[in-house]
Curated annotation (Swiss-Prot):
Its biological purpose: Channel that opens in response to stretch forces in the membrane lipid bilayer. May participate in the regulation of osmotic pressure changes within the cell.
Assembly information from the UniProt record: Homopentamer.
Family recorded in the similarity comment: Belongs to the MscL family.
Family matches, as Gene3D superfamilies: Large-conductance mechanosensitive channel, MscL, domain 1
UniProt name for this protein: Large-conductance mechanosensitive channel
Main localization, broad class: membrane
A single GO molecular function term of this UniProt record: mechanosensitive monoatomic ion channel activity
Highest taxon of the lineage: Bacteria
Keywords for this protein: Cell inner membrane, Cell membrane, Ion channel, Ion transport, Membrane, Transmembrane, Transmembrane helix, Transport
Pfam families for the chain: MscL (PF01741)
Entry GO terms, CC: plasma membrane
TM ranges: 21-41, 45-65, 92-112
Length: 148
């Protein structure tokens, strides 16, 4: 067998194994789930925070200018300041990402907790005793007949 065909066989064995496929599915679902959490934060939670705080609070545009370039007179937006070389602490973006992470971790925790509870329930359920083999049944019948 040539090295190339051996390599291809080894790769096929790796790719077809359940663990590699499970990992690939998990990564794809995780990426999609991350987008859902991001949308929940941006489209549901942040509008509620804005409503509660009584204004238009967009944390992603909150920042602190640590050092602006000398003589800078342009717009005081995060994108323009960083483009001009300012040192900017983007605390609002960090806060938004932190909220995303906390929500994602909370949802994963709830899912894992539910799965563990289902597994415990499955383990706690007493298994029905297996039916005795046919030869044991016949021997018991013979024993019972001999007792009579």
């Amino acid at each position: 067998m040539s090295k190339a065909s051996g390599f291809l066989k080894e790769f096929r064995d790796f790719a077809v194994k359940g663990n590699a496929i499970d990992l690939a599915v998990g990564v794809i679902i995780g990426a999609a789930f991350g987008k859902i959490v991001d949308s929940v934060v941006k489209d549901l939670i942040m509008p509620l925070v804005n409503y509660i705080l009584g204004g238009s609070v967009d944390f992603s545009n909150k920042f602190l200018v640590l050092s602006a370039p000398d003589g800078y007179a342009g717009p005081m937006t995060y994108a323009d300041l960083t483009k001009a070389g300012a040192i900017v602490l983007a605390w609002g973006n960090f806060l938004t990402i932190l909220i995303n992470f906390i929500l994602l971790a909370l949802v994963v925790f709830i899912i894992v907790k539910a799965i563990n509870a289902a597994r415990r329930k499955e383990e706690e359920a007493p298994a029905e005793p297996a039916a005795p083999p046919e030869d044991v049944v016949v021997l018991r019948e013979i024993r019972d007949l001999l007792k009579k």
